[in-house]
Amino acid sequence: MAALTRNKKKGSNSQTPPLNKQTKASPLKKAAKTQKPPLKKQRKCISEKKPLKKPEVSTDEEEEEEENEQSDEGSESGSDLFSDGDEEGNNDSDDDDDDDDDDDDDDEDAEPLAEDFLDGSDNEEVTMGSDLDSDSGGSKLERKSRAIDRKRKKEVQDADDEFKMNIKEKPDEFQLPTQKELEEEARRPPDLPSLQMRIREIVRILSNFKDLKPKGDKHERNDYVGQLKADLSSYYGYNEFLIGTLIEMFPVVELMELIEAFEKKRPTSIRTNTLKTRRRDLADILLNRGVNLDPLSKWSKVGLIVYDSQVPIGATPEYLAGFYMLQSASSFLPVMALAPREKERVVDMAAAPGGKTTYVAALMKNTGIIYANEMKVPRLKSLSANLHRMGVTNTIVCNYDGRELTKVLGQSSVDRVLLDAPCSGTGVISKDESVKTSKSADDIKKFAHLQKQLILGAIDLVDANSKTGGYIVYSTCSVMIPENEAVIDYALKNRDVKLVPCGLDFGRPGFSSFREHRFHPSLEKTRRFYPHVHNMDGFFVAKLKKMSNAMQPSGNDEPAVTMEQAQVSSSDDDDEKAEAIEELEKPPVASGQPKRESNTKEDTNKRKNPRSKEIHKGKRNKNTKTESGNVEEPRKQKKKRSQWKNEIAQAREEKRKTMRENAKETPKHRG
């Protein structure tokens, strides 16, 4: 009963203040009721009242629960309290709308309002508190977001102002360095950032020299090209010959892309051995071992590209079992162009380490015969090991010079030949950076001479009458034109062959002209591959079809020469050269000694008719009979003296002069 009377007193007290306040309300305050209270002021008043009366609210709630259990009067008083709380909440919002001058009056009125407000339901208080907390948190986020927005706007404005200032200010035009500046640079260590900036400016100007050349600059295009050569040589480490050749082959913008691509490593690729497994099965196994890989490309059905691996890719159980071969993507191309068929006779003239040979064996399904030739003995070990590991059983390994294979296997004895010729390696600089400085013009000439001999030997091996074959594929890992297009053009002029499409859907066509050289128009059927375009090593591929077994093209005026006749003529020239050298090496005859009688009948016959020796031996007889039985007339040819013969003739003449002088001086000494 004590609790009941206490609540009744509180209820009566809570009802009186609103009545008094309504009577005392001024017309200004009534007008302010219709307006929305300021958000900041309302938050301030509520936050100040909340902590003062929290303990009283909890005790009143317990007493109200007891009243509800005992009688119905408690429920009526609770409803009155609930309604009073609503009225007082409205009055409290009215007080918040007062001006700053009436702060003291608001504080006095707030005390009874706070009691009545807190006597309300607990749910209302909790919701109000959560709203306050969310409002305070939201206000902080809003302030932060506004600050960030202001900062961004300021940065954008500053950037715009700076850009406008740069437009107004006239930029300094690029000028080539003078001779004095270049000499000073040579004395100092290389300044790589300044070199890079100069290279960019020169490339930009050379890309459109007519329009971008600085006004008033008297330098010509060659001056800019010369400076670019020097800067690229010092920045990337190339010798002047190699960088000069690349500048002549490519536009300057593409040249920079090529050089930058040479500085990056090519992705690792592997080839599935279809003799033992399938690409899908191999990929699943390697993925389970932690190898991140993907199919190589649409043009290859057996290639996989490896991004990274948790295990050494060249030491997995699958590698040792011969399920795949570590092989660059560019090495797939010559074999794909060769397209060998089953039960054919194929020659790989430079087979080590066996990547292409094992690919050919897989395409032939271990049928037919493959002659895997390698001239260098140390490389035969890796070739034989890979053949055994990959399960190849149709291959014969041989160790000959590629130029001598026709003597071993016979002329026109095979269906297809793959010649991946030794070259300068200018397409694989990313693997061997020593190529930048080690290769010179003489090296390119030596490689080109060897390649011309090898391709003629490869053509002579192929049988033009083969029902399924008669093809030769020539490839190099070089980008130099003398090693690629010039070699193919030489083969077209010296053998009865023609170029056919390589069967590759991508790649750039070869050069049909370069500098003063003009090649056969069909050289556009060859294919070039570059690292900056195809993301593989620089490579060249050409495919030839042998039309006849003649040694020279049918269109030439000179008759076709067989292999035996060519060997005889070369051996005869060697014999003549050896005889001339022996004669020069003979000691001069002393003046007191009698001269040897060398004017025999045989010697006189040799001097009168130097080809009598050849006719006597029967090696060369021009009056040969044709198939019809008629004797051909000897062909009149102009005598061409080679350089070594001229040197020998000069040496002989000098020797004769010295002998004459000695013969004239001898009688004077005797007298």
Swiss-Prot record:
UniProt cross-references to InterPro entries, sorted A to Z: MeTrfase_RsmB-F_NOP2_cat, MeTrfase_RsmB-F_NOP2_dom, Nop2p, RCMT, RCMT_NOP2, RsmB/NOL1/NOP2-like_CS, SAM-dependent_MTases_sf
Binding-site list for S-adenosyl-L-methionine: 350-356, 374, 401, 420
Subcellular location, record wording: Nucleus; Nucleus, Nucleolus
UniProtKB keywords: Methyltransferase, Nucleus, Ribosome biogenesis, RNA-binding, rRNA processing, S-adenosyl-L-methionine, Transferase
Chain positions of motif Nuclear localization signal 3: 594-601
GO biological process per UniProt: RNA methylation; rRNA processing
Biased composition (Low complexity): 129-139
NCBIfam families: nop2p (TIGR00446)
Protein family membership: Belongs to the class I-like SAM-binding methyltransferase superfamily. RsmB/NOP family.
Function of the protein: Involved in ribosomal large subunit assembly. S-adenosyl-L-methionine-dependent methyltransferase that probably methylates the C(5) position of cytosine 1586 (m5C1586) in mitochondrial 26S rRNA. May play a role in the regulation of the cell cycle and the increased nucleolar activity that is associated with the cell proliferation. Seems involved in the regulation of cell proliferation.
Protein name listed in UniProt: 26S rRNA (cytosine-C(5))-methyltransferase NOP2B
Gene: NOP2B
